[in-house]
């Protein structure tokens, strides 16, 4: 994959972004947190089985909840849909289940926020758009990325050909 600029499909401009992606060849952004709407099972463009290769998949971005935070806050019907689709078995393992789903997708690029690797809740959220104060303050502690975590991350990257 060349150095492309991921086109962020903001909801109000989705049709313009889709055309830009088609015309330019820029990779599209796919945010897993946007995939699980129980009212449209199987058809949502953010579900991994609907991806093309020319995209960048994220569990979430700096503007979203952490994966663990999202899982705890999302509507029950959407959480149950995500459980069935991703294979989540508990809140404790949810973030890693979503990380695995991102890695096994066909997306050319996979980006995982460190907070999700660390299985942190919304206390580690980076930004809450349209709010003042408290944004961009989270910092990873120096000893947070243990050797065990690094090995787990490496194993996932190697297993899915993303090393």
Which residues fall in each region the model found?
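Short loop/turn microsegments at loop-to-beta-strand junctions
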Residues: 1, 53, 127-128
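Short glycine-rich loop/turn motifs that provide flexible caps or phosphate-binding loops at active sites
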Residues: 1, 59, 132-135
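Short, small-residue-biased leader/transition segments that mark boundaries at the very start
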Residues: 3-10
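Conserved, mostly hydrophobic/aromatic
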Residues: 5, 62, 136
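Conserved active-site loop/cleft motifs that coordinate metal ions or position small ligands
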Residues: 8, 109-114, 137-140
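Conserved alpha/beta catalytic core and glycan-binding cleft of carbohydrate-active enzymes
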Residues: 12-122
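Structured C-terminal cap/extension of enzyme domains
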Residues: 119-163
């Amino acid at each position: 994959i060349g150095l492309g600029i991921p086109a962020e499909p903001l909801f109000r401009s989705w049709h313009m972004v889709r055309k830009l992606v088609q015309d330019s060849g820029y990779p599209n952004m796919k945010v897993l947190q946007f995939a699980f709407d129980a009212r449209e099972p199987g058809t949502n463009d953010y579900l991994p089985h609907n991806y093309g290769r020319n995209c960048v998949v994220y569990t979430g971005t700096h503007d979203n909840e952490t994966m663990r935070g999202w899982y705890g806050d999302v509507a029950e019907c959407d959480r149950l849909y995500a459980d069935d689709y991703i294979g989540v078995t508990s809140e404790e393992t949810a973030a890693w289940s979503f990380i695995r789903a991102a890695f096994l997708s066909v997306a050319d690029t996979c980006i995982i926020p460190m907070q999700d690797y660390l299985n942190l809740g919304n206390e580690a959220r980076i930004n809450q758009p349209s709010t003042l104060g408290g944004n961009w303050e989270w910092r990873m502690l120096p000893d947070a990325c243990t050797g065990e975590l690094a090995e787990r991350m490496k194993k996932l990257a190697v297993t899915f050909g993303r090393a």
